[in-house]
A protein has these predicted regions:
Chain B
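Terminal low-complexity/charged segments
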Residues: 1-229, 388, 392-394, 399, ...
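Metal/cofactor-centered catalytic core regions of large enzymes
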Residues: 164-587
């Protein structure tokens, strides 16, 4: 009975989270086009529905009904597998993200946390591990297409992911030192009580924050680090030979990854579901949703940042990307660890 | 007689057959023996008084009736001395061979290949004499020869080398037939098939284009890569070759103007201008001052459009997409003005031989003024995004560097040459229009890298705005087209009412006008560089031969030189920095 209740509650939570993420992906495809358009003095999609709000649905239908092409020389097993390898890790990471206050309910004798699928104590490690697996999708997709542009894109992706994942991992160590835990819930809980308790401000994790944000832009292959895709050089990089739903899988994975790194960023540095003021304004159960709302606002702030950067910056070159990753970001991240460790040691 | 010609005749008494000054503009012409061309070219290049450091263009003219059928013409330009010379050599039909001048001017490489391709003249000693505009296995002859029909030989389905659409595709063992494997690796040629050890195995042959998002049309580039680094880049041109030069031989002079629109379709007005100026030079026709001012204003508007287009696409290639949309926003304003002016937006057709088609209206002048008022602020907007952007600097500084010496030797002109620090602008060197009546400067770069060329073009837009403003202020009243009834038809209103004018109009448009026998080369400063028209007139209503000196074509000759050693990502930067338009390049 206990197992059944636990499984039922988990499935329900997973369903809610998955649907939310998928809807957010759909919103993002439109939001990105709209935000870019406004920054570029144009209107963006306007044809499908009022102000083009039904555009994601039209895109989805189009991609769904497109012919599925596997190139003659491609390795079809890996070619079909790659989009799946890309997509699944992108979604799996959401299992450990706390969306709302850390509350517990007793349901038929089973303790349930409604705002997180699973509060495992190595949450952040789990996210990083699955993010690395996602990179295999890109590399395999590039290799299996049997196309030189795809191969170059895949190789670039491999190099880029290795360089920048390292920086992501090192950038958050400062936060982990402050929280003393790898659990995202614990990290969020430690930042309760107003914005001066957030790791970014109270924990003085400014360097870590900057390194994390830049590295996560690189990890999600977004401009100015979209070298694996690099549409003006490599046509579409590793996605050159993909069409229809396989392409849509890669596309969804990219956006899901963006959402995931935004969620992690807001939990690690901006206090997650905590409001910038102590406590909540709304009483009781509404207060929980106030937390969820704050979390959403923070995530969308990061997502907007992605679009904003894309509209502003040109693309880096491969060697510049590597130099930037290893010679600028890595030393900064290491310095952050050293300083944080010393400060924490002295103050305790 | 010009001192230079005397000097040349004295230096090479045997090789120089004749020297003369031709036409009303006293063009310097030297007729020489073909075998002596490299020697004379070397002398003209090295001699401090001649100093012909640039080979503007070269072409061949076919005279089937003459004993020596072909005439190869080298159009030389000296930047330090600012004079031009036409070097001519006659070749017989049975052995049309002439030594190459690639040893003197590196830019001759592509130009000689073009002459070989279209006229069938062999250049002895040329490093890579292949067809350039026609397909490499084209077997139907040489299109610009007079015995080649204008409509061409055969049509699509009769050419064995083109795939048939109505038959199933023949199965191929691999994408590249065995015998064509690695045709671009010159070093490997002449060796047995299995000797692969001469080259390192890591090199990757990447075919970029003709369908590629960043090649600005249908340019194909075969890259040999070592990792992401370019070992060799071979441009493959001709996908947009329409035989404009051949077509023009069958058209009356006025009918050619619309064909020039389609050359550089981004800046069609400039092409019109360059062409009508060449014809006017041939006719020795003076243009009224108001028309000169209007032409200058419109040409500068077109230059701003061309540079905006370039800036947008170059930025987009490098990944800064916002600049692209912003430049198109400003371009739109100018296109609207063009629409007011002549009814079209892209393939504009406004210049006429002897003047322009219609006068400026006050509304148009007011709109143009309003544009000029806001334009500096918009330029500032682009600067904010790019000028000091660290990533932009890293992507453009020290990329595709070409030294001033090399740039001149390759025949680069326009912003590409000025980016290398050579202040050569035809508007200053050989003033036309109203350029000598207004105040403006020629911006020059220092390092000859992509950033300098970017800076030069942005500065040129500011100068263009300045020129337009001054021209609008100074513009005199008066007619907008020359008074030459032999050449210029009466105004349309009179034609519709008046019998004599109708006859006059009819005669000019059915018979054309007949310029005097002669040749002329006239170059103009297009946004891409020196756009020249060389016209040979036999006294008839149609040009006997017309050669277009296209800056994009000449610039692509320097591509390999500029691309070697850079990364794949830089290829798109280099494409962009030339501002190539394939319509003009392939003609």
């Amino acid at each position: 009975m206990d197992m059944l209740v636990f499984a039922g509650a988990s499935v329900a939570k997973i369903a809610v989270v998955m649907v939310t993420v998928l809807i957010t992906v759909a919103i993002l495809t439109l939001a990105e086009r709209k935000v870019l358009s406004w920054m570029q003095d144009r209107m963006g999609p306007m044809e499908v529905g009022p102000y083009g709000i039904l555009q994601p649905i039209a895109d989805g239908i189009k991609l769904f009904f497109k012919e599925d092409i596997i190139p003659a020389g491609a390795n079809w097993v890996l070619f079909s597998l790659a989009p799946i390898i890309s997509l699944i890790p992108a979604f799996i990471g959401f299992a450990v993200v706390p969306y709302g206050p850390n509350i517990e309910y007793e349901l038929y004798g089973v303790t349930i946390k409604p705002f997180i699928i699973s509060d495992i104590n190595i949450g952040i490690l789990y996210v990083l591990a699955f993010a690395s697996i996602g990179a295999y999708g890109v590399i395999l997709g590039g290799w299996a297409s049997n196309n030189k542009y795809s191969l170059l894109g895949g190789l670039r992706a491999a190099a880029q992911v290795i360089s920048y994942e390292l920086n992501v991992g090192l950038a958050i160590i400062g936060v982990l030192i402050l929280a003393g835990s790898l659990s995202l819930v614990t990290i969020a809980e430690k930042q309760a009580g107003g914005f001066w308790h957030w790791n970014l401000i109270g924990g003085l994790q400014i360097i870590g924050f900057v390194v994390y944000v830049i590295s996560s832009v690189a990890e999600t292959n977004r401009l100015p680090f979209d070298l694996p895709e690099a549409d003006s050089e490599l046509v579409a990089g590793w996605m050159t030979e993909y069409s229809g739903m396989r392409f849509a899988f890669f596309f969804m994975a990219e956006y899901a990854n963006m959402i995931l790194v935004s969620c992690i960023a807001s939990v690690l540095f901006l206090g997650g579901y905590h409001a910038p003021y102590p406590g909540t304004l709304l009483p009781g159960i509404l207060g929980y949703f106030e937390g969820v709302a704050w979390f959403t606002v923070k995530v969308y702030f990061f997502l907007f940042l992605f679009f904003w950067i894309r509209a502003t910056l040109p693309r880096l070159r491969y060697d510049q990307l590597m130099r930037f990753g290893w010679k600028v970001m890595l030393p900064l991240a290491l310095a952050n660890i050293v300083i944080t460790a010393i400060v924490v040691y002295v103050l305790r | 007689m010009h001192a230079l010609l005397t000097r040349l005749a004295e230096r090479f008494p045997d090789a120089v057959l004749a020297v003369r000054e031709e036409g009303p503009y006293k063009d310097l012409v030297a007729q020489v023996k073909p075998a002596a061309v490299p020697e004379i070219a070397r002398f003209l290049h090295d001699d401090p008084e001649a100093a012909f450091d640039m080979l503007s263009d070269m072409l061949a003219v076919d005279y089937p009736e003459d004993e020596d059928r072909f005439e190869v013409i080298y159009l030389l330009k000296s930047l330090p001395r600012n004079h031009r010379l036409r070097l001519k050599a006659r070749l017989p039909e049975d052995d049309p061979t002439i030594p190459t001048v690639t040893t003197v001017w590196k830019g001759a490489n592509f130009l000689e290949r073009e002459v070989f391709d279209l006229m069938g003249i062999t250049f002895a000693g040329h490093p890579d004499l292949r067809r350039i505009l026609m397909p490499e296995d084209y077997d139907e002859g040489y299109p610009l020869r007079k015995d080649f029909p204008t409509e061409g030989r055969g049509w699509r389905s009769t050419f064995p080398f083109l795939p048939r659409l109505d038959e199933p595709a023949a199965p191929m063992a691999s994408e590249v037939p065995e015998d064509q494997h690695r045709p671009f690796l010159k070093e490997a040629e002449g060796l047995p098939k299995d000797t692969k050890a001469v080259r390192r195995q890591e090199e990757l042959l990447l075919n970029m284009g003709p369908q590629h998002p960043a090649t600005h049309g249908v340019l194909r580039m075969v890259l040999e890569l070592e990792g992401e680094r370019i070992v060799k880049a071979t441009p493959d041109l001709g996908y947009l070759h329409r035989g404009v030069e051949k077509l023009c031989e069958g058209l009356a002079y006025q009918q050619i103007i619309p064909h020039t629109d389609r050359l550089d379709y981004v800046c069609s007005m400039t092409n019109n201008y360059a062409y009508v100026r060449a014809v006017e030079k041939l006719l020795n026709l003076a243009v009224p001052p108001r028309a000169e001012y209007i032409r200058t204003v419109v040409a500068e508007m077109q230059r701003i459009i061309g540079h905006l287009f370039w800036l947008g696409t170059q930025a987009l290639d490098i990944g800064a997409m916002t600049v692209f949309f912003w430049t198109f926003r400003e371009r739109e304003v100018l296109l609207d003005i063009f629409e007011k002016l002549c009814g079209a937006r892209l393939t504009l057709n406004y210049y006429r031989i002897g003047g322009v088609d219609s006068d400026f209206t006050p509304d148009l002048v007011q709109r143009l003024g309003a544009f000029l008022d806001t334009f500096p602020a918009h330029l500032h907007e682009y600067d904010e995004l790019l000028l000091t952007n660290r990533i932009w600097l890293a992507r453009t500084k020290h990329v595709a560097v070409i030294s001033a010496e090399d740039a001149v030797n390759f025949g680069c002109t326009g912003p590409v040459l000025r980016g290398s620090g050579v202040a050569y602008d035809i508007r200053k060197a050989e003033p036309y229009g109203a350029y000598d009546k207004v105040e403006w400067e020629v911006p020059v770069g220092k390092n000859g890298d992509t950033y300098d060329r970017y800076w030069v073009r942005l500065e040129e837009m500011r100068q263009s705005a300045k020129i337009i403003r001054q021209c609008l202020a100074q513009m005199p009243e008066g007619p907008i087209i020359a008074d030459a009834p032999q050449i210029i038809p009466p105004p349309k209103q009179k034609v519709m009412r008046d019998m004599e004018s109708l006859i006059h109009h009819f005669i000019i448009f059915t018979q054309g006008f007949k310029p005097p026998k002669g040749e002329t080369y006239c170059s103009s400063e297009a946004p891409k560089g020196e756009l020249g028209f060389f016209i040979v007139s036999d006294g008839g209503p149609k040009p006997y031969r017309m050669k277009i000196r296209s800056p994009s074509f000449v610039h692509l000759g320097a591509f390999d030189h500029m691309a070697r050693g850079y990364l794949i990502a830089d290829i798109v930067t280099i494409f962009g920095t030339y501002d190539v338009v394939m319509g003009e390049c392939d003609r």
